[in-house]
């Protein structure tokens, strides 16, 4: 190995010992310098990767064809994205490869063999255009290898790959309107480590499919050889933990991760190639790994399971986010699920990879997955510096085969390589033996039937302590040893879980207080203990384990900063665990509370942990809310009106909740999306959406500000826009949303928010335009309705004519009458406290201020009166109401038997009650006066009115007295109390005074004008 840590290939690489002229050496050195100096960043950098998900079984039918690379028959249509990858990338590559093979066969000197192979290709192509049998036949290996040596073909295959992935990603992107389509990965950094990122993948129903974890590996530089012989240094790459089994939610998933350049950065978009895992919906609805698509040919930088995959593309080296071990796992799962085989860049690419030895065993689709990983051609094996708790792995560099190699040099290099491998195996065996001994000791302790729980705990603690304090072990080996103890505790079937939690706490305490471990190594042990604690069977044991571990952190001799880091590590482990949101919420809340109380968390750490807790809480709330909404929507016994009312109640609870406006918006977006995607009729869904919108618009401004209402309304529209409903239904629901805003008297800011929701939705531009037109049409219709209602309300009204009894005129008079007392009071003030000039200015300002306030109040009243819900009515309506009210008052007056009761009635109902209009009160007085005059006419026949005569003449009663027959008849007509002449005089006086008082109200409200009236002539 060279001093700088790179592999010294001259010892092991036969080609490195080839003699070059001085000119050739200078040329090679210059090419290497030029390559290493290429640091210009592309203008358009490729995305990290893309994710596409679906919860619809209609979009994904599991393929049942064998692991052969065949495209499924029409009757077995596979996932459309998987099919598109085959048709736009894999099949065109195969077609070009076959074309080159046929050209090579035509130039073959053995014409019989050439004709035989040509017929074999043509006959199979008629049956199976993928030619899987041809590519799987070992006898065809040399023809495939030779074709791939053609540089023009290599360029074609690379261009097909780049263009194909770009086309697939664009066609099936969410931005293009494909439901649940490809969208860039949104990674979130772990708080505890900057080299760890994660993202939660959900199906289009919002259910979690899996959590992807990405690790950026900073490694000691190692070299990889390109096909032209130049070498490239690799010091950074990433690994993604692609899931093997998915059992959380239904649907399909495609993970397409961009290959990184040799320096660990992303390539430009025009050079981007991807490693894609296709998970199609299985028979049970859960995603199954059915196929892997990757660039060709796929190689690995070593023989160990942790060796990273890489490719050479366009003359450059790119690393893929998958290791040899992970690739083997994935291929085994593909075979298990009987999915489509990998394309040219997998099983078949491995067969035809350039530079492979002819003696290597052929990898066919029917072989086991472990053999489907291409072994490297030349292994340069030296003991690299790696953590001693992991087996040491040789670094591998694949070199081109096209040059002639000296057999003696090759044999010498191979022998030396074998010796180095033996040395590595010996070192690894020693380390493995130490860890195995620790495991055996832990197992023996826990299985000792003679020991009780306390003794077992003491012995486990002693074992962990001895491991940490063993000076013969490296720090990494100590970590591996303690973790082996923890793993043994986890797997033990005899120890109760609560007792296991105590062992975890004690083991963590030993590690944290050790002076032989660095903080990073202590954290590794703590994280392993948390993993074991979270794997316990019941929630009480899990809670006890986490509580004990955090107690150990607080009691340790770590610095406050390191304690905070440990708490964050515990929180991160809880956050990414497979536990339910409810349990995560409880555990994370407990960790946060304890960290705050112990004052080990910085404000930034508290905020980050609180954000994670809020996300979990919001997710749980969202899940519970959507379940309630679905229960309402699918209730067969409730009609649309009842469904709307019940969902409105849920909306109100969400708006009143403690969550942020953003979280409330997310929940309501899920609700509208659920409603829009339901199986109800379009008009029923629109009615429910209208109710939701009205509830948001009318919600109290004190608990929900106007900007937050607008934010939530935009989210509501986004839920509609991104739903699976067809476009006409979404247009109708958008109109319903706007109608609800107008019904709820929402302002223009809320209406504009609907457009914002459309703009921010993940749909194509034509759909956005259609929804905006629907929104504008609904707004115009609502304004037309308001205008029409105002017009109807003003029919028959002449607002400009100032009649004494007109409502508008009276409102203006009220303003004047209210201002007059203010002016009079100021004029009477004779105690100036300032100079005359200042007093005039102050008084004038005060008067104007009062006038302004009163004017604003009255104008608002005037506006309210003119609104569709105001009190402005037509003359006919007002007349009918007045007559009805007058009759009610006269009837009520008639129930009063004594003069005192009648006078009290007049004062209370006709003078003091200002809620009645002047017109009604005056008409009532006029009618009562007429009644009194009829009674008077009975006593004085000379003033008897025609009305009374007519009424009296219709009476069929006989006179009681011959002297005064009319009196008796009149008693029957007007009632016995109304013939009391003295009482009549008092009542008539009271009525006339009341009339004068009412008429003078506009002139002086506080002082009614009394009028002296003499009794009428008798």
From Swiss-Prot:
Primary subcellular site in the record, as a coarse category: cytoplasm
Gene Ontology, cellular component aspect: cytoplasm
InterPro entries: Rickettsia_antigen_120kDa
Keywords recorded for this protein, A-Z: Cytoplasm
Region (Disordered): 1-82, 355-402, 995-1018
Location within or outside the cell: Cytoplasm
Pfam families from the UniProt entry: 120_Rick_ant (PF12574)
Basic and acidic residues bias (residue ranges): 19-34, 1009-1018
Biased composition (Polar residues): 1-11, 69-80, 355-380, 387-402, 996-1007
Start-end of Low complexity biased regions: 53-68
Coiled coil stretches, renumbered: none
Superkingdom of source: Bacteria
NCBIfam families associated with the record: Sca4_fam (NF038365)
Protein name: Antigenic heat-stable 120 kDa protein
Originating species: Rickettsia japonica (strain ATCC VR-1363 / YH)
Organism classification: Bacteria, Pseudomonadati, Pseudomonadota, Alphaproteobacteria, Rickettsiales
């Amino acid at each position: 190995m060279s001093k700088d840590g790179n592999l010294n290939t001259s010892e092991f690489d036969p080609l490195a010992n080839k003699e070059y002229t001085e000119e050739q050496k200078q040329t090679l050195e210059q090419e290497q310098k030029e390559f290493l100096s290429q640091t210009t960043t592309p203008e358009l950098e490729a995305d990290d990767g893309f994710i596409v998900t679906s919860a619809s079984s209609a979009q994904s039918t599991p393929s049942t064809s064998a692991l052969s690379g065949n495209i499924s028959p029409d009757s077995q249509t596979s996932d459309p994205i998987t099919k598109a990858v085959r048709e736009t990338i894999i099949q065109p590559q195969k077609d070009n490869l076959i074309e080159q093979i046929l050209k090579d066969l035509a130039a073959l000197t053995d014409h019989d063999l050439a004709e035989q192979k040509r017929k074999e290709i043509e006959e199979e192509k008629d049956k199976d255009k993928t030619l899987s049998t041809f590519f799987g036949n070992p006898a065809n290996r040399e023809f495939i290898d030779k074709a791939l040596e053609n540089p023009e073909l290599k360029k074609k295959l690379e261009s097909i790959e780049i263009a194909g992935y770009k086309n697939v990603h664009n066609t099936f992107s969410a931005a293009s309107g494909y439901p649940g389509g490809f969208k860039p990965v949104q990674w979130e950094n772990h708080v505890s480590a900057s080299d760890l990122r994660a993202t939660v993948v959900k199906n289009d129903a919002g259910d979690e499919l899996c959590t992807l974890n990405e690790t950026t590996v900073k490694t000691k530089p190692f070299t990889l050889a390109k096909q032209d012989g130049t070498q490239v240094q690799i010091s950074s790459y990433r690994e993604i933990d692609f899931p093997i089994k998915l059992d959380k939610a239904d649907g399909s998933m495609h993970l397409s991760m961009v290959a990184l350049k040799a320096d660990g950065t992303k390539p430009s978009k025009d050079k981007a190639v991807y490693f894609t895992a296709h998970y199609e919906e299985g028979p049970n609805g859960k995603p199954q790994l059915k196929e892997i698509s990757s660039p060709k040919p796929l190689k690995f930088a070593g023989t160990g399971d942790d060796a990273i995959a890489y490719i050479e593309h366009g003359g450059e080296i790119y690393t893929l986010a998958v290791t040899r071990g992970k690739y083997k796992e994935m291929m085994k799962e593909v075979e298990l699920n009987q999915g489509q085989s990998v394309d040219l860049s997998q099983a078949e690419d491995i067969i035809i990879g350039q530079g492979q030895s002819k003696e290597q065993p052929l990898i066919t689709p029917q072989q086991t997955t472990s053999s489907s990983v291409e072994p490297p051609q030349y292994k340069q094996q030296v003991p690299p510096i790696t953590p001693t708790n992991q087996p040491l792995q040789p670094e591998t560099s694949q070199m081109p085969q096209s040059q002639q190699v000296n057999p003696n040099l090759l044999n010498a290099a191979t022998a030396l390589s074998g010796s180095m491998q033996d040395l590595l195996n010996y070192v690894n065996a020693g380390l493995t033996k130490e860890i195995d001994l620790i495991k055996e000791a832990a197992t023996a302790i826990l299985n000792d039937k003679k020991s009780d729980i306390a003794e077992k705990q003491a012995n486990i603690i002693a074992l962990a302590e001895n491991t940490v304090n063993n000076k013969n072990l490296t720090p990494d080996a100590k970590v591996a040893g303690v973790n082996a103890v923890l793993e043994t505790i986890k797997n033990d079937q005899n120890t109760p879980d609560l007792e296991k939690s105590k062992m975890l706490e004690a083991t963590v305490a030993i590690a944290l207080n050790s002076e032989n471990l660095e903080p990073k190594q202590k954290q590794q042990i703590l994280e392993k203990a948390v993993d074991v604690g979270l794997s316990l069977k019941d929630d009480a044991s899990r809670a006890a384990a986490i509580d004990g571990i955090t107690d150990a952190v607080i009691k340790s001799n770590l610095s406050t900063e390191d304690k905070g880091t440990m708490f964050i590590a515990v929180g991160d482990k809880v956050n990414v665990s497979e536990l339910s949101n409810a349990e995560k919420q409880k555990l994370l809340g407990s960790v946060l509370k304890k960290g705050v109380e112990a004052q080990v968390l910085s404000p930034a750490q508290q905020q980050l942990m609180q954000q994670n807790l809020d996300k979990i809480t919001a997710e749980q709330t969202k899940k519970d809310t959507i379940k309630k909404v679905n229960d309402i929507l699918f209730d067969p016994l409730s009609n649309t009106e009842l469904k709307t009312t019940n969902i409105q109640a849920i909306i109100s609870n969400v708006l009143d909740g403690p969550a942020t406006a953003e979280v409330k918006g997310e929940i309501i977006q899920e609700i509208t999306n659920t409603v829009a995607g339901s199986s109800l009729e379009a008009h029923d869904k629109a009615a429910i959406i209208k109710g939701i919108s009205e509830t948001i618009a009318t919600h109290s401004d004190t608990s929900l500000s106007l900007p937050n209402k607008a934010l939530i309304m935009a989210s509501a529209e986004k839920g509609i826009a991104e739903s699976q409903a067809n476009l006409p239904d979404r247009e109708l629901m958008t109109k319903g949303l706007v109608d609800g805003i107008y019904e709820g008297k929402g302002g223009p800011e809320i209406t504009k928010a609907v457009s914002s929701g459309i703009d921010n939705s993940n749909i194509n531009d034509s759909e956005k335009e259609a929804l905006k037109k629907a929104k504008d049409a609904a707004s115009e219709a609502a304004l037309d309705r308001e205008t029409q209602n105002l017009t109807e309300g003003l029919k028959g009204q002449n607002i400009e004519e100032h009649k004494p009894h007109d409502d508008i005129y009276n409102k203006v008079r009220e303003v004047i009458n209210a201002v007059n007392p203010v002016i009079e009071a100021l004029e009477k003030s004779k105690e100036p406290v300032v100079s005359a000039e200042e007093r005039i200015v102050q008084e004038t300002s005060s008067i104007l201020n009062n006038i302004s306030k009163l004017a604003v109040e009255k104008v608002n009243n005037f506006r309210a009166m003119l609104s569709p819900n105001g009190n402005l009515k037509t003359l006919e309506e007002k007349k009918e109401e007045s007559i009805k009210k007058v009759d009610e008052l006269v009837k009520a007056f008639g129930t009063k038997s004594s003069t005192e009761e009648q006078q009290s009635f007049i004062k209370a109902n006709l003078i003091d009650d200002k809620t009645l209009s002047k017109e009604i009160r005056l008409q009532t007085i006029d009618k009562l006066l007429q009644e009194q005059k009829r009674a008077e006419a009975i006593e004085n026949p000379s003033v008897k009115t025609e009305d009374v005569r007519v009424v009296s003449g219709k009476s069929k009663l006989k006179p009681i007295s011959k002297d005064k027959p009319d009196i008796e008849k009149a008693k029957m007509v007007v009632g016995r109390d109304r013939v009391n002449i003295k009482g009549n005089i008092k009542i008539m006086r009271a009525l006339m005074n009341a009339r004068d008082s009412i008429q003078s109200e506009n002139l002086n409200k506080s002082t009614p004008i009394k009028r002296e009236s003499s009794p009428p002539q008798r």
